[in-house]
């Protein structure tokens, strides 16, 4: 309840007119349940108070209303409170419903926040017939598992036999770390097999395509003549010699076998080392660093799952640190002008073997000969395509197949006269591999996994019959087919 206070100024006429205005405001007040504030005004500050006289009435007069009304607020709606706005909202003296329901709006928001907090910790409540951990390899509990996967998101009341919370159950749950590693290793192995199978399928489709193969082989034969290493690269070297290069490549073979790298990675790494030897003088204390960095670059380019850079520092027995390898990588890539991919004899060998439908044993023989050619620096004088063609011819003769079919001559433009000298040097390397000083490649291809192709006899008699002027004085060894068995 409110009573109106009105200020009566010394000027009776002004007070009278003000009282009339106040009554009009009260009469015109809306009856929609809204309280209006009656504002009294005074002109005491506007006019100076006259001197007090005995006969005049007091300055301030308290008038009490004869009647008054009490208005109550309506019940606020929970949802659409903003719709409960009076039609006379334009009137500046009327307070909107939003302001009157502010407390209710805050209470509603607090309730919503409380419900959200309860849903957030919903998983902490117990269940009566199911538990999340029942899906794992934990011993069976006292409760029965009768729920579906959809029921796992529902909250149930705890039963008398199972009152432990899910959080407490998870606290006692543990994974088998070794089992997890085994499963992860199996997944990685499956991924590698799938990636390798996909790559082989792409290679088969590329090499067997009669539409695209002529353009592909023409382009690769042209590319092999660009950025080639020189067989005279050691003429500019003052501290590194051919024996050190042979030791490095023999070590490469062990690294490739240890990490199960692709054969193309091995050939590309050797190609990068030879290009570095042809470009600048290398200090012997940094030669292994150049080789390690070249292997890392080749691995990044060829492998699907390359090892970490720390592994390359580890294979050097921490002789070189990671910053040293990264610095050398920047240096080599700058020297190569970032041209890394080059056609190698491994690429041509794979291409020719697929075109001639080689067996696995014949393919292993081809790759064995190609890796032997990496050891001798004098093979740098031959083109990679000629080395690959000679290796395929050698494998055909060893398997009693036509040495170099006319179809390959038509497809590649390479004839036997182009690689007869290469074939002679490959035959020599094949015979001397078992007695060489560095036998890593020989031992690798003498294993059962490689079908022991390094132990097969060389087709010396067939080579002599085909090229009598070249293989007249061919040496004999335990691998020679013409030697007594």
Curated annotation (Swiss-Prot):
Renumbered residue ranges of the record's region Disordered: 1-24
Nucleotide-binding among keywords: no
GO cellular component: cyclin A2-CDK2 complex; cytoplasm; microtubule organizing center; nucleus
Tissue distribution of the protein: Expressed in the cell lineages ABarp, C and E as well as the NSM neuroblasts.
InterPro entries per the UniProt record, alphabetical: Cyclin (IPR039361), Cyclin-like_dom (IPR013763), Cyclin-like_sf (IPR036915), Cyclin_A/B-like (IPR046965), Cyclin_C-dom (IPR004367), Cyclin_N (IPR006671)
One Pfam match: Cyclin_C
UniProt biased composition (Polar residues): 8-24
Protein's UniProt name: G2/mitotic-specific cyclin-A1
Organism: Caenorhabditis elegans
């Amino acid at each position: 309840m409110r009573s109106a206070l009105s200020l009566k100024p010394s000027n009776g006429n002004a007070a009278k007119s003000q009282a009339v205005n106040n009554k009009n405001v009260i009469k015109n007040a809306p009856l929609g349940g809204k309280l209006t504030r009656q504002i009294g005004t005074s002109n005491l500050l506007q006019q100076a108070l006259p001197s007090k006289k005995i006969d005049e009435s007091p300055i301030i007069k308290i008038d009490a209303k004869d009647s008054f009304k009490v208005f109550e607020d309506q019940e606020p709606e929970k949802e659409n409170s903003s719709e409960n706005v009076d039609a006379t909202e334009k009137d500046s003296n009327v307070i909107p419903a939003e302001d009157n329901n502010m407390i209710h709006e805050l209470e509603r928001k607090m309730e919503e926040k409380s419900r959200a907090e309860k849903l957030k910790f919903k998983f902490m409540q117990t269940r009566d017939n199911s538990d999340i951990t029942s899906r794992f390899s934990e011993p069976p509990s006292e409760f029965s598992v009768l729920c579906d996967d959809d029921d796992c998101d529902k909250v149930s009341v705890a039963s008398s036999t199972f009152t432990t919370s899910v959080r407490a159950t998870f606290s006692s749950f543990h994974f088998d770390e070794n089992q997890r590693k085994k499963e992860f290793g199996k997944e990685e192995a499956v991924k590698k097999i799938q990636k390798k199978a996909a790559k082989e399928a792409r290679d088969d489709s590329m090499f067997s395509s009669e539409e695209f193969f002529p353009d592909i082989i023409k382009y690769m034969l042209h590319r092999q003549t660009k950025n080639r290493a020189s067989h005279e690269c050691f003429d500019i070297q003052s501290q590194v010699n051919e024996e050190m290069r042979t030791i490095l490549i023999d070590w490469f073979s062990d690294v490739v076998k240890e990490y199960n790298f692709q054969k193309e990675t091995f050939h590309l790494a050797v190609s990068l080392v030879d290009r570095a030897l042809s470009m600048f003088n290398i200090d012997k204390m940094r030669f292994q660093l150049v080789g390690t960095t070249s292997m890392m670059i080749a691995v990044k380019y060829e492998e699907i799952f390359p090892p970490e850079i720390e592994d390359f520092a580890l294979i050097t027995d921490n002789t070189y640190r990671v910053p040293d390898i990264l610095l050398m990588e920047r240096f080599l890539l700058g020297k190569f002008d970032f041209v890394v991919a080059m056609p190698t004899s491994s690429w041509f060998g794979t291409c020719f073997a697929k075109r001639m439908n080689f067996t696995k044993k014949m393919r292993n023989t081809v790759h064995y000969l190609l890796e032997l050619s990496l050891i001798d620096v004098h093979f740098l004088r031959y083109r990679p395509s000629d080395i690959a063609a000679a290796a395929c011819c050698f494998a055909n003769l060893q398997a009693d197949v036509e040495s170099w079919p006319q179809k390959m001559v038509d497809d590649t433009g390479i004839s036997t006269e182009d690689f007869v000298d290469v074939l002679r040097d490959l035959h020599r390397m094949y015979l001397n591999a078992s007695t060489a000083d560095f036998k890593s490649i020989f031992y690798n291809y003498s294993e059962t996994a490689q079908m022991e192709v390094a132990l097969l006899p060389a087709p010396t008699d067939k080579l002599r019959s085909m090229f009598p002027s070249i293989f007249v004085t061919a040496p004999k060894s335990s691998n020679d087919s013409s030697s007594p068995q």
